[in-house]
Amino acid sequence: MNRPWLLWIPLAVVAFIGGLAIYGLAVPKDDQVHSAMMGKKLPEFALPAATAGVPALSNTDMTDGKPRLLNIFASWCLPCKAEAPYLEALKAAGVEIDAIAIRDKPEDVAAFLAEFGNPFRRIGSDSEMAVQLKLGSSGVPETYVIGGDGTILFQHIGDIRAEHVPMLIEKVNAAK
């Protein structure tokens, strides 16, 4: 018995699998992995000052009742350099910003601040990336909105750009 329609079954299976593959590639995905610390208190830490003339940073510095940003950066990070003017704009808008410098030397942090400005109230040095990992940070730069009680309210992954400034101001103001 001749069954020519059986030849179409493998073709239909291949077409179906190909269609699924194309759909999977065409649908945009959220490829950012957010911290499991969202909605939780900052982990305990006390970091030494990242450079002379700028105070050190601990988790208790961020429990004074004032919401703020916590920026994770590095002097060697190109996107960190690109976001520097927008951090200055946030500071000019009255947003308090603390920072953690990742795997950096004091002289490199000082040179970074001299070239790009210092929007930070305090900068802790996390040379081992221990605090960065406790925060659930996956890279630099990253910025967190911290409530006045030390709760992590929001995480911005990647560099801050002009379009992010109003949103971050709004999130800090909403935390007041």
Outline where the language-model segments fall:
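N-terminal targeting signals for export/organelle localization
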Residues: 1-48, 176
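Conserved Rossmann-like nucleotide-binding pocket used by diverse enzymes
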Residues: 43, 73, 98
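A short beta-strand-turn-helix
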Residues: 45-69
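Hydrophobic beta-strand anchors of alpha/beta hydrolase catalytic cores
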Residues: 69-70, 97, 143
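Aromatic-flanked redox-active Cys/Sec active sites in thiol-based oxidoreductases
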Residues: 71-77
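Structural microenvironment flanking redox-active thiols in thiol-disulfide oxidoreductases
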Residues: 81-117, 127-133
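Thiol/disulfide oxidoreductase modules built on the thioredoxin-like
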Residues: 114-119, 126-176
